[in-house]
Amino acid sequence: MSDAPELMQGPLEDRHRALGASFAEFGGWLMPVSYTGTVSEHNATRNAAGLFDVSHLGKALVRGPGAAEFVNSALTNDLRRIGPGKAQYTLCCNESGGVIDDLIAYYVADDEIFLVPNAANTAAVVAALQAAAPSGLTITDLHRSYAVLAVQGPRSTEVLAALGLPTEMDYMGYADSSYNGVSVRVCRTGYTGEHGYELLPPWESAGVVFDALAAAVAEVGGSPAGLGARDTLRTEMGYPLHGHELSLDISPLQARCGWAIGWKKDAFFGREALLAEKAAGPRRLPRGLRMVGRGVLRPGLTVLNGSTPVGVTTSGTFSPTLQIGIALALIDTDAGVEDGQQITVDVRGRAVECEVVRPPFVEAKTR
């Protein structure tokens, strides 16, 4: 008998199986990886629209007098930059400046902030906030209360309009709406680099919304897309993935996420450590690698400048858009590696030539 914990499942597994999905574990969840193939789903998203079920993402609610003020004193970004109807990328750090998680904070009201962390880190984020919260505030884990459906791509607005859902929000804005009697929070957010939306219907009613979105996506020439395409899309954009480009050992500064830190704030988790690192300068930074020849790079490979190890790959894939192998790598800042320079990556004892570039690998079209 296996002692492995049973994988959690989203609310739409039967629908994914009916669509021919293949599945894999991600963050403790059984998730659809692909339907017709990662490359075709990637291209459908770049050229028309992709429909992603990312209900494994966490959800949590901070509620009570001073909720916004408390979240602002805990998470890195300055919540005072936004207000109700807006969302913000931010980070939850430990006192050493390591990243417990990166997440999206939705400003509902001064006394209500809705959070969407990564699946595997939800409990840790909730625990960190609960440990610091003053009396009168509640931090509630709502992981299975809401599904998350992402519609991404240049024709995503047409898809939502076909369902009568709001589309006029600015990037990182959101609006509460409904479809066929089901309440839906519609957010102008995403993880693909394309114009897109993320929708949060109630967990138990997600199928109604998913079915309608799937039909509308097909009408514009798009398709359902799995986590395989989500990863190739985000890697082309150079977006960090926790556990790869961000972790307890990889700080926001080392991930070039200093823009998501409110440096003028009096308090946030990890502030002193991050201020010290900012003053000294991060010891390593993410760079992009484009393979010169054929092949695919994977995480955990040694990057060399000549014969000297200077870093390690954190993500790697074949880019369907560029038709080459690409990777993200953490490179030592004192190694003197410049954009445009040729370096090598050790792939099972073979030196693979790559060009150093500054991500993103393709142009962002989020706005």
Swiss-Prot record:
Return the GO cellular component terms, semicolon-separated. Answer: cytosol; glycine cleavage complex
Q: Which residues cross the membrane?
A: none
Reaction catalysed by this enzyme? N(6)-[(R)-S(8)-aminomethyldihydrolipoyl]-L-lysyl-[protein] + (6S)-5,6,7,8-tetrahydrofolate = N(6)-[(R)-dihydrolipoyl]-L-lysyl-[protein] + (6R)-5,10-methylene-5,6,7,8-tetrahydrofolate + NH4(+)
Q: Pfam families, per this entry?
A: GCV_T, GCV_T_C
Q: Which UniProt keywords apply?
A: Aminotransferase, Transferase
In terms of SUPFAM superfamilies, this protein maps to: Aminomethyltransferase beta-barrel domain, Folate-binding domain
| GO terms for MF | aminomethyltransferase activity; transaminase activity
Q: How does it assemble?
A: The glycine cleavage system is composed of four proteins: P, T, L and H.
Family of the protein in this entry: Belongs to the GcvT family.
Supply the HAMAP family for this chain.
Answer: GcvT
This molecule's function is given as: The glycine cleavage system catalyzes the degradation of glycine.
The name this protein goes by in its record: Aminomethyltransferase
Which organism does this record belong to? Mycobacterium ulcerans (strain Agy99)
